[in-house]
């Protein structure tokens, strides 16, 4: 009886950590922490991003955002674009790379009619900041019928 090798589960976070490991002095250690799924306290930027996405999701689910809210303008604009989309869509897809079975695992922020959106919260805007992110290619592989992918 032969034993079949386990599929390796790969997330966009792991791919991004691997890519990051080549860019900084302690990038490899950061990658190992991600690989070991070590919990780290969230940074202020991470907490702000989570709060922003929660407010956006609440508005998409019918909540009214007060006009004096600091994010009123951008949340109103984004919620109009994302209206009718599925939120937090978890997907898995098996692929084979070099004879090794791999399970791609992604959680798409928003999906509607072949369009994927990923919400990125930042205090500063840099055009094409995520253009070469491994997340783009991976999510387009997860949703092969997707026509495009937008970071918002």
Predicted regions and their residues:
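Mg2+/Mn2+-dependent nuclease catalytic core
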Residues: 89-152
């Amino acid at each position: 009886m032969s034993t079949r090798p386990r599929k390796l589960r790969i997330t966009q976070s792991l791919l991004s950590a691997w890519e990051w490991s080549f860019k900084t002095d302690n990038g490899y250690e950061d990658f190992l922490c991600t690989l070991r799924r070590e919990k780290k306290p969230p940074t202020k930027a991470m907490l702000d991003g989570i709060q922003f996405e929660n407010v956006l999701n609440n508005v998409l689910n019918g909540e009214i955002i007060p006009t004096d809210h600091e994010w009123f303008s951008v949340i109103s604009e984004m919620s109009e674009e994302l209206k009718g989309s599925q939120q937090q869509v978890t997907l898995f897809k098996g692929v084979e790379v070099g004879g090794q079975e791999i399970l791609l695992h992604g959680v798409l922020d928003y999906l509607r009619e072949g369009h994927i959106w990923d919400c990125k919260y930042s205090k500063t805007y840099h055009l094409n900041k995520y253009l070469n992110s491994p997340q783009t290619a991976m999510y387009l592989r997860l949703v092969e019928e997707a026509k495009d992918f937008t970071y918002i």
